Amino acid sequence: MAGLILRKEEFFPSATQAVAVADRYPQNVFAEHTHEFCELVLVWRGNGLHVLNDRPWRITRGDLFYIRAEDKHSYASVNDLVLQNIIYCPERLQLNFDWAGAIPGLFGTPWKPHWRMGSTGMAQARQVISQLEHECARRDAQGNAMAELLFAQLALTLQRHRYATDDPAATQREALLDKLLAALAASLSRPFVLERFCEQEGGSERALRQQFRQQTGMTINHYLRQLRICHAQYLLQHTERLIGDIAMQCGFEDSNYFSVVFSREIGMSPGQWRQRSRAAA
């Protein structure tokens, strides 16, 4: 059975249009698919499971993905997940601009799909996307040209403000919530103490907990546990490490407790997941 392929004609009104904006307010569960076009995915709020080329990512506010046409991905376990897809056809781009320099993986350049954006960059990107959406709706030559200019501006804005998911140093000028998300991503294998984090950053623990839940739809502990489970899934599928070693690498000192948590979240034991994921690959 052939996989689901999203076709250009379903999303681009004309054969000359290079860029379009696909809103997902909210993003529902979506089966695995590929595309005849590329896309940028920026998450505004809520949470969900994004599986990209068989690798699971627990996504929430500020997550940014660069998706190539051949990449297969899906969305599951969504909870008020709000995101925008900026879709584009590389072969239709006319503007003399270094697209490959700004967009990882384009035209065979090194591909790193997953990044994060802080509040400052997200606010700037939102303004550009709003203008881009307006121009795409015009459906004329001037609108197409303006849309391409704005897409170049967006690509540069994302390039300027994106940072590695586990790089807390990159968030020093960002809001406290952005710093927290980066600190959590850098704590997959070691304990994270919110009280200590708030002391270091001079923030209110109670206020930060409330803000985190409001923006992501999860508690801080739940989000960190989901990050660790996703990382464990990846290691189980792609390495030969013992389950006990993987448990330690994912922040679980007790392998039995790891197995209990993993089974509760995934619906099968770590060993069963390893066997099933490899059989499906």
Swiss-Prot record:
It comes from the Bacteria. Activates expression of the rhaSR operon in response to L-rhamnose. The record marks D245 as: Interaction with sigma-70. One of its GO terms (cellular component) is cytoplasm. Its main location: cytoplasm. GO terms for biological process: positive regulation of DNA-templated transcription; rhamnose metabolic process. One of its GO terms (molecular function) is DNA-binding transcription factor activity. This is HTH-type transcriptional activator RhaR. Keywords: Activator, Cytoplasm, DNA-binding, Repeat, Rhamnose metabolism, Transcription, Transcription regulation. Residues 178-276 form the HTH araC/xylS-type domain. Binds DNA as a dimer. Residues 195-216, 243-266 bind DNA. It is found in: Cytoplasm. It holds the Pfam family AraC_binding. InterPro entries: AraC-bd, Homeodomain-like_sf, HTH-like, HTH_AraC, HTH_AraC-typ_CS, RhaR_RhaS-like_N, RmlC-like_jellyroll, Tscrpt_act_RhaR.
